[in-house]
């Protein structure tokens, strides 16, 4: 997918999660 410029190492995807991004390999991906 496309990186969503948000990491999810310590906290889950927040803003980008609203855009449909999911956590993969410590980074939020579309």
Curated annotation (Swiss-Prot):
Disulfide bonds: 4-21, 8-23, 13-28
Keyword check for Disulfide bond: yes
Record-linked SUPFAM superfamilies: Cyclotides (SSF57038)
Modifications the protein undergoes after translation, according to the UniProt entry: This is a cyclic peptide.
GO BP annotations, alphabetical order: defense response
Cross-link Cyclopeptide (Gly-Asp) mapped to chain: 1-30
Superkingdom assignment: Eukaryota
Keywords from the named record: Disulfide bond, Knottin, Plant defense
Family indicated by similarity: Belongs to the cyclotide family. Bracelet subfamily.
Record note on domains: The presence of a 'disulfide through disulfide knot' structurally defines this protein as a knottin.
Function summary: Probably participates in a plant defense mechanism.
Name assigned to this protein: Kalata-B16
Native source species: Oldenlandia affinis
